[in-house]
Structure formats: structure tokens, C-alpha cells
Amino acid sequence: MSGAPRLVFAGTPDFAVPSLQALLEAGHRPVAVYTQPDRRAGRGRRPRPSPVKQQAEAQGLPVRQPESLRDPRAQAELAELAPDLMVVIAYGLILPQAVLQIPALGCVNLHASLLPRWRGAAPIQRAILAGDDETGVCLMRMEAGLDTGPVLARARCPIGPRETGGSLHDRLAALAGTLLHDRLDDLLADRLPAQPQPEAGVCYADKLRKDEAWLDWRRDARQLDRQVRAFNPWPVAQTLCQGQVLRVWEAEPVAAPAGDAAPGTVVRADGDGIVVVAGEGALRLQTLQAAGGRPLGVREFLNGRALQAGERLG
């Protein structure tokens, strides 16, 4: 292409910010940044701009916030920009075929998994829930299907034994920015071979639901541990304690205690943790949040709370 490439960036949450920054650090200022419309949030229900919008405006970049890219007017406005390439990461709006065909070099997406594993909305948490040892980021050419396009580049990332949804989110966000920065010149020069995704190994990362956060004490303690870690910081694992919702922010699996206590039974509650029997093994709760309270370490949580061995959770 002659002259500087005309790039459009599309993203919305914190996860997309490092990739926008990567474009800027590589010397490319997008001709427009697309992000979702401001959403009402907080106690005052005031419109709140997305993290990508805040970053774009801080850099003096033009921002566009259509409600939908299915709207012919929004498509016409995008076409008027005459983009060479559209970079998409966690945008949250569907790009119809008419939009995918607008940029001269097409649209590419940065996805937080090693495709074809974990296509879909929640690949970070699903990887932890499944007990995967590894994940990563894929740069792929977009098609009409859900995360089905050929992969142009990928970067791998181990999942640590105490990894949470939040910590893995942050590491993958940074990795996506690095991958984009390192491969951008080859991408713009069309030097990245497109590798079709194999059919073997395809699985889908469904959107997280709040009702998945309930801990079923009949399950293996290792599964419960993965649930606690995957759902930190949202929707946060929870159980019932003395008739009230108790959120569990941090826990770890431990050996099963002696005896035949039923799953959900508290067998110890002290400054080292609240140990609860599981279907296999036990779970030691370390950071908890009572209804209406804030997250507390177990020692502080137990101050003034009469939680005794023999009580049942759930």
C-alpha cells in the first residue's frame, strides 16, 4: 500500500486497551476507534465511557459508538473512512459480512485462547474451570462464523496453579498487545500465512452466568478450587452460611479430614482457614465476603462470627 496504512480499531473493555496502546507505540494512529456506547453504571446510574473510549480520547483519537454495525448508516460511515485494516478485540458487537468486506485487508481479531479451543465469549474463565495447563492469544482473520477464521499468529501462555480469572485476564491482555505490536508490519504487508482451524479440538466458551457461581460441595475439592479461581473477580463463587450468602474470593484444596462428615461440613474454623468437606478432599476458605460486607481475610472474617466445626455450608 502507498502511504501510511489507514487503521480502524474496535474494542471496549480493559482487555482491549493494551492492544490500542500497541498500535500507538508502533507508530500507527487509528483513523477511528470504535467502542460500545456509554452504559449506565454505579449507584447514580450515570453513563460511563468504556475503558477504550477513555484511552482513545486521552490520545486525541476520534471515537465512534454505533449501537449496531448492522445499521446501513453505520456501515456507510465506516466505508467513508476507507480503512486498510480493522483490528478488533473484545468489541462486543457483531460484525456482519458487509462490514468484514469494507477494509482493503479485511478485519482481524485478537482472541484470548489457543483456537480452535474455547471459541466464544468467556475463554479465560473456561480454560481455568477445565483445568487447562496452557492458553494464549490468537490473531485471526475474521469470518462470519464465531471465532472460526484462519489463524495468522499465536502466542502461548501457561496457566499457573493459583491463577485467577483476573490475573489471567491481565496477562493475556498484555500478551495480545505484544503479539499485535510484533506482528503488525507483517500483517500490513500480508506476510502472515493463514492457517485454517482444524475441526478436531473445537469447543466453545459460553458466556458466564451468575448461577454458575454456587459451590456444590458434593464436587471434588479441586473442581471447587478452579471454580473459585475462575470466577474471581466475577461473578465470585458463593455458598450459604448460616442462611446468608457467603462469597468466596480465595480458597485452596487440602487433604480430606479424618472421619465421615458430609460434604459442606465445616471441620475447622480458625486463623489458618475455614476447612469444608467436599465430595473428594476438602476446601480451605481464605478470603470471604459476607452479605453487605467487603472481602476479608479469614482471621478478620471470624472476628465476631461464631462459626463452629460441625456447621454446614450450602
Curated annotation (Swiss-Prot):
Pfam families: Formyl_trans_C, Formyl_trans_N. Coiled coil: none annotated. Keywords: Protein biosynthesis, Transferase. One of its GO terms (cellular component) is cytosol. PROSITE patterns: GART. Its EC number is 2.1.2.9. The keyword Oxidoreductase does not apply. (6S)-5,6,7,8-tetrahydrofolate binds at S113, L114, L115, P116. InterPro entries: Fmt, Formyl_trans_C, Formyl_trans_C_sf, Formyl_transf_N, Formyl_transf_N_sf, Formyl_transferase-like_C_sf, GART_AS, Met-tRNA-FMT_C. The keyword Transferase applies. Disulfide bonds: none annotated. Residues 34-69 are annotated as: Disordered. It catalyses: L-methionyl-tRNA(fMet) + (6R)-10-formyltetrahydrofolate = N-formyl-L-methionyl-tRNA(fMet) + (6S)-5,6,7,8-tetrahydrofolate + H(+). GO terms for molecular function: methionyl-tRNA formyltransferase activity. It comes from the Bacteria. HAMAP family: Formyl_trans. Attaches a formyl group to the free amino group of methionyl-tRNA(fMet). The formyl group appears to play a dual role in the initiator identity of N-formylmethionyl-tRNA by promoting its recognition by IF2 and preventing the misappropriation of this tRNA by the elongation apparatus. Belongs to the Fmt family. This is Methionyl-tRNA formyltransferase. It comes from Alkalilimnicola ehrlichii (strain ATCC BAA-1101 / DSM 17681 / MLHE-1). The lineage of its organism: Bacteria, Pseudomonadati, Pseudomonadota, Gammaproteobacteria, Chromatiales. The gene is fmt.
